[in-house]
Amino acid sequence: NVLAVGNGPVFLLAAKTAAAAGYPTTIVSARTELFNQLLWAEDEDRDANLRILGVTEDEDVTAFNEAVASADALIVAFDAEQTLTDTLLDVVLPAEGGASRVACLSKHLSGKGMGPFVTASKVAANKEVWCAPPERVEMYRSFEAKLKAKVAAKGGDVTIVRGGTLKGGGPGDPESVQTVAPTLAPRFYAEIVADLVNWQLLFDCETRGVELTPGDSAAGPGLQAVFTATASDARPGDSGRVQVAQALVRSLALDGAAGKEFGVTTKAARDHPSDGEWEAEFAKVL
């Protein structure tokens, strides 16, 4: 059983991907109706493996407590630049019982390829650009250390999946929809700020490949940042949400991923990677 916590499109995608991989998966939402519209296209069958709990009913709270206790694995995936609070971390990872395997989405923290141009592009072009400000880098580092210590204390393992600027997450245009990897519904594009929609949709059609990088070695866009911020092709510093979700979920089944960290970067491709291509990428970094 998998429990997924976080926020935003990458969180929903990770949960949908886990369910599609055959894991009974639980998430909690205060906005169940919107979540369902983002998760499932109108003509798409809902996956019985994915359970969305509300937060209002007593039975939801009971079901959530049961989901925490029965979880084998925990996925932590925040779209926004934030981490779990200490209180919530204690709730989803109790000292006794609960998940012993954790896949956590973090960021590239090395500072390579960052700097004033990247920071400027976040302000001017795309507020979702990852520009590695020192206080956020410290926040992620401190959370990773806390998470690893907590999981190690109960004999478990953490895999850290590092991303940069998160892009895409939907099915692409209607002509190019694929079923190899789960995506969010077309409604995803309606939720994006108007001037960001077109290149996100193009990204979901053109940049379906993935390249994994060992440890914390991936670089940001550097001087190119102003051009990469809203680019739909494969550029340094970017990570596709669909590929990040795949990496999080696939790492759970890989013994070699326990205790490891790696980065997810982009690669031009009209097709989502096959199982064989994923195996080859993991072999490079684990």
Language-model-detected regions and their locations in the chain:
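Oxidoreductase cofactor-interface core, primarily capturing Rossmann-like NAD(P)-dependent enzymes
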Residues: 1-50, 59-71, 79-82, 86, ...
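Hydrophobic beta-strand segment of the Class I
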Residues: 74
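Short beta->alpha junction loops
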Residues: 55-57
